[in-house]
């Protein structure tokens, strides 16, 4: 950071930084926390979800928790490109939203959704066709393969909707509605997923527990669609009024 500051002072002399201007601004701080706190909560929710699912699965067999752990590691390779896409999408949407350029905002959202869908379809296809190959990366035993192959195929069904939900969540944050993103994330990983997984575990059939992921994703997709429509409507009004 000091090195970057030094380079900035050398090459950007038109920007002058004075100590008297570095002060606490409650209005700016409020906006930072309004966007940042939901992101912090969403990051922590994943740990709670993992803990809850492990507790539910361990009742059946420790191998089920091993399968879930393997899945959690493998799925990161599918979701990582989506998160990278988000990192590039959010500043573009935020800038053009502030500049009242609706066409660029909606074009960015549309292209991001298409790209996310392609990535997720590829991930879904790999999980459907090569589940045993993926599990063998973890030296899976016969028991682990017997549990893991159907698990990966069932859980990967949720990929088909997950791309849209993740993009929508980032759109909410980019346009200044982080609460929508928080609600969707909480419902997806806690309010729906864990209770449904627990209820399905009461049947005594492990394969049914995996269906809690697609069920939670359907609920997430529904909420994301509703919130996105509201966001689009309000964003259009704001950008049109700014343009006028």
Predicted regions and their residues:
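Short membrane-interface helical motifs at transmembrane helix boundaries
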Residues: 122-145, 149
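Single conserved hydrophobic/aromatic residue that forms the stacking wall/gate
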Residues: 1-11
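Interfacial/gating helices of multi-pass transporter permease domains
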Residues: 28-35, 57-76, 103, 142-149, ...
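Helix-terminus/linker motif at the lipid-water interface of multi-pass membrane proteins
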Residues: 44-71, 77, 95-96, 133-142, ...
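Hydrophobic faces of transmembrane alpha-helices in multi-pass small-molecule transporters and flippases
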Residues: 21-52, 56-57, 77-81, 85, ...
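Small-residue-rich hydrophobic transmembrane alpha-helices
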Residues: 67-125, 129-131, 162-184
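Small-residue-rich transmembrane alpha-helices that serve as helix-helix interface/gating elements
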Residues: 5, 151, 207-226
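Alpha-helical transmembrane segments of multi-pass membrane proteins
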Residues: 76, 142-168, 187
